[in-house]
Amino acid sequence: QDPRAGEVMVKIAASGVCHTDEVAQQQMIPVPLPAVLGHEGCGIVEKVGEGVTEFQKGDHVLFSFGYCGHCNSCLAGRPYACENFNAINFGGVMSDGTKRLSKDGQEISSFFGQSSFATYSVVHKNSIIKVDKDLDLDILGPLGCGIQTGAGAVLNRLKPTAGSSLVVFGCGTVGMSAIMAAHLCPCKNIIAVGGNEKSLALAKELGATHTNKRKKCDCIVGEIKKITGGGADYAIDTSGVPDFVKKALACVKFLGTAVVLGVTGELTIQVQEELMGEGKSLIGIVEGDSNPKLFIPQLISYYKEGKFPFDRLIRVFEFDEINEAFEASHSGNAIKALLKMR
């Protein structure tokens, strides 16, 4: 359907693939089916709905998560904590409670307010960020989710001072983005824990000062304490593997902070022994604590200055290679798989 008030129709240029798409497909996030997935999209504006003045036909744009814009969190500048976040992004409907997609008379659910695995998408203006036309549009979509999640966790929430130490478990898109952000701070010690030598080598090029193979993770806590002189200031788990979350908490020093960014299964923590006894913090961060309309342009500025080379994470696939793209993501043959739609 055409865009309604406050909405924009965009012809999709490309979309990143993300583990969250699979989580929704597998119904770990109960998005109503059938649905069109995809939530790291970018493209060119085709039409604008009533009341939309900030975008026009031909604009280059990328998408981020949806938010209502009128709850207490949104009004306080925290759209990542929108009180209607789950309904807007995972409820299968647009912000007005209706659907824009259908096939043979059957309504189809949307995802993350964008459903970017498609030729066209209708998106609320809240989720759209305009970008300069001199940028390579195709690579920008992942900024709207995975990249801002990792980078934002560091730059928006942790805000490490120069000389701090940070450990990142997982060298996928989120982890690599956190490493690049930590390098910007700059942290003294940036320790990457990853699954294969190729990704660890890239992590080193992007700013990691030390690397550790995940298969050798049993002794990682001791190694980190040796490198950092007693424990890291911060540790981020991007894998969602419960054992790595526990190791992230164990490797930070007294009053240190461990962060969970991945979808994590059941986990048992001994509060006195592992958390309270040393004044540690264990926190979850959603979408990098980001206000996308402000933070994504900041990341693009860093990229243009050569300080945030996120393009090195990307491997491009054609849309009909979508299954291969997900397989490459699983195997580590692609850090950020990107589907080209044009």
Protein language model annotation of sequence segments:
Residues 2-15, 28-75, 80, 129-134:
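Glycine-rich beta-strand-centered segment in the early N-terminal region that forms part
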Residues 72-169:
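NAD(P)H dinucleotide-binding glycine-rich loop of Rossmann-like/cofactor-binding domains
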Residues 246-250, 293-342:
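C-terminal hydrophobic helical "lid"/dimerization subdomain
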Residues 256-257, 280:
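Glycine-centered, small-residue-biased loops immediately flanking beta-strands
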Residues 162-171, 183-247:
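Adenosine-nucleotide cofactor-binding segment
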Residues 175-176:
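N-terminal Rossmann-fold NAD(P) dinucleotide-binding loop
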Residues 262-279, 294-298:
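Rossmann-fold NAD(P)-binding glycine/threonine-rich loop
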